[in-house]
């Protein structure tokens, strides 16, 4: 039990298992290039480099202004890590075929944590993104030092760079091409090691650093030396040069205001229940300083809330189950038998925690769902064993004889019953790919819990039964009225009722069979007409009955500027935001991409999405909505948006 408690406290806690999706996202930035140039010079070259990569199911690519996006999907159950390394080597080995001006490609191994971070820390305010970025960078340093944090990524920041604008007429006049200028600038803006040197104090490394530091450094770069000895420099074809920001491909806002977001991703052993409070401590440390600058911190996508809710559900379910089963067993077999049967529930769960911890699994919504599902099953075996031992005691056997005979008599039936339950869930392990890995914790947790309960009821429970009340206690047997033996009145009443029902069933067996088949086909008919919508006897809901966030996807005409999409998202955010926080918690807007239902990214300057977070169930107070039904709230949102968005924009809403 002590080891089980230690394992429970040591288990990583997360919302969902951090499953590898078997996909790699390759992002390559090519500043200033048109979508057509990106397609021909970057995307196609990278695809060609991956032609002979094995175990690839498909490659899906998109080219945008200044950016190439390629998703490579591997065949299910491949060695994803090995394939990821091979893919990376192939792309980097083909860099000579790519334009010199591109940024090094970024490789993201897509997993659940990439799209569902532990928590998002958003800095919002009427300040420039550069100012917000400086504050976020300072906070990022402390957030990265939190135990259990794998990485902290910054989004919404603008990359600062020096823009050189050339004069086309001067270039024609001097016979200078754009490529010549680019090559000259790249050749001059370098840093490279020049060897080692020794002196009296020791050895040091010599580095030649010729990177640009001033505008004049750029202007003096030689593009070409003519035959007469004259030089053509950048300043000869320069129109203007100034510090600026690279055009973003995603613009983020929260509650209709500019923001810079810090995405916090936990490592495999991290515990959400520990990480989020530590994040709040860091935020509180910066709160006063940020408030003076007019900056507000808003936390979104806090996964701890959902984990807490799942743990509360499991705890309530276990508590109610223990109380009800205890009362039932107490009524039929007495207090001692009830306690002995109930001991199996915590024992089985703690033994399961040891197994989960030893095999590298985690506590999450999937495993917690499995525990809730199995919580009513694990006590069944203990009830059978306790009842049979109790029956042998009633028949006059000694305590030791009753324990031995009662347990051995039901050992094989209990094992057979347990095996059939396990066999019903084990086929889930046959599922392949990321889906199979995602749901694998259900059969693993259920099988471990049932196996633990089997061990407890056949080994531990008989020992407890023998030790309590002890060998010297003389069991009393009382003959109750209306019973045929020494059993309790409630048991006798149930037995008589059962005998009558069974007798009538056997007497009218054909009628019974007809009723069984009739009810079976009636239930099938009800299910069919309800699902088809012809006669909905059972209400079929498109959305889940309860949820705490939903997505609103916007798509504008092709060619819409990213800034226009961002402004449209801000307008919708401001339009939906209520005056009361008990109606809506936050709205996070991201212009430039949205996620499909299966979490596949779709990029484009004309698309974007809103992530709307609702208050928790107990904190909601929707205006003029009965029972604070989120489905009714969503219907109202749809009506509002339909009247707000014009015909040029399409809108989709989904939980």
Model-identified regions with their sequence ranges:
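Surface-exposed amphipathic alpha-helical segments in non-transmembrane regions
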Residues: 1-6, 10, 41-58, 73-160, ...
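Juxtamembrane "pre-transmembrane" interface segments
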Residues: 153-157, 165, 236-238, 253-327, ...
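Helix-loop junctions and hydrophobic alpha-helical segments within the transmembrane domains
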Residues: 300, 311, 386, 392-419, ...
């Amino acid at each position: 039990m002590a080891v089980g408690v230690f394992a429970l406290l040591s288990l990583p806690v997360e919302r969902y298992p951090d499953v590898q999706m078997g996909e790699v996202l390759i992002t390559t930035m090519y500043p200033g290039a048109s979508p057509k140039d990106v397609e021909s010079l970057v995307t196609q070259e990278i695809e060609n480099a991956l032609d002979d990569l094995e175990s690839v199911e498909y490659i899906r690519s998109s080219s945008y202004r200044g950016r190439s996006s390629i998703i490579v999907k591997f065949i299910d159950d491949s060695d994803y890590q090995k394939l990821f390394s091979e893919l990376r080597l192939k792309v980097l080995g083909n860099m000579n075929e790519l334009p010199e001006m591109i940024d090094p490609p970024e490789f993201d191994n897509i997993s659940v944590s990439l799209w569902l971070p532990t928590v998002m820390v958003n800095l919002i305010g009427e300040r420039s993104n550069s100012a917000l970025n400086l504050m976020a960078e300072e906070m990022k340093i402390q957030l990265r030092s939190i135990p259990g944090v794998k990485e902290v990524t910054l989004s919404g920041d603008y990359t600062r760079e020096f823009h050189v604008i050339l004069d086309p007429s001067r270039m024609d006049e001097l016979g200078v091409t754009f490529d010549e200028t680019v090559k000259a600038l790249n050749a001059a803006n370098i840093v490279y090691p020049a060897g080692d040197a020794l002196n009296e104090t020791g050895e040091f490394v010599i580095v030649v650093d010729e990177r640009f530091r001033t505008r004049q450094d750029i202007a003096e770069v030689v593009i070409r030396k003519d035959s007469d000895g004259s030089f053509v420099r950048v300043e000869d074809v320069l129109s203007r040069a100034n510090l600026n920001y690279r055009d973003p491909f995603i613009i983020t806002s929260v509650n209709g205001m500019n923001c810079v977001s810090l995405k916090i991703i936990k490592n495999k052993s991290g515990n959400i229940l520990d990480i989020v409070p530590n994040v709040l401590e860091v935020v509180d440390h910066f709160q006063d300083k940020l408030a003076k600058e007019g900056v507000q911190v808003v936390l979104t996508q806090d996964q701890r809330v959902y984990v807490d809710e799942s743990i509360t559900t499991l705890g309530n379910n276990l508590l109610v189950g223990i109380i009800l089963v205890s009362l039932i067993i107490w009524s039929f077999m007495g207090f001692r038998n009830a306690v002995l049967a109930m001991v199996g529930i915590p024992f089985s769960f703690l033994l399961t925690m040891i197994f989960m911890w030893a095999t590298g699994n985690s506590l999450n919504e999937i495993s917690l769902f499995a525990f809730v599902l199995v919580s009513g099953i694990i006590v069944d075996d203990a009830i059978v064993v306790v009842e049979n031992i109790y029956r042998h005691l009633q028949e006059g056997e000694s305590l030791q004889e009753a324990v031995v005979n009662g347990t051995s008599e039901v050992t094989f039936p209990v094992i057979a019953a347990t095996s059939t339950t396990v066999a019903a869930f084990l086929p889930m392990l046959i599922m392949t790919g990321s889906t199979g890995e995602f749901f694998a914790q259900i059969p693993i947790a259920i099988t471990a819990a049932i196996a633990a309960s089997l061990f407890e009821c056949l080994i531990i429970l008989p020992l407890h039964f023998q030790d309590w009340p002890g060998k010297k206690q003389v069991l009393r047997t009382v003959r109750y009225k209306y019973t045929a033996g020494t059993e309790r009145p409630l048991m006798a009443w149930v037995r008589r009722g059962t005998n009558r029902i069974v007798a009538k069933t056997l007497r009218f067996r054909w009628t019974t069979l007809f009723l069984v088949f009739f009810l079976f086909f009636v239930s099938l008919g009800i299910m069919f007409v309800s699902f088809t919508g012809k006669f909905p006897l059972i209400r079929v809901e498109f959305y889940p009955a309860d949820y705490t966030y939903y997505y609103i996807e916007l798509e504008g005409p092709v060619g819409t500027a990213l800034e226009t999409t961002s402004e449209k998202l801000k307008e919708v955010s401001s339009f939906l935001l209520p005056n009361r926080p008990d109606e809506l918690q936050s709205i996070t807007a991201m212009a430039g991409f949205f996620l499909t239902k299966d979490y596949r990214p779709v990029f484009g300057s004309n698309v974007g999405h809103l992530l709307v977070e609702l208050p928790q169930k107990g904190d909601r107070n929707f205006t003029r909505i009965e029972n604070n039904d989120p489905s009714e709230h969503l219907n109202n949102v749809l009506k509002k948006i339909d009247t707000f968005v014009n015909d040029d924009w399409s809108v989709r809403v989904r939980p």
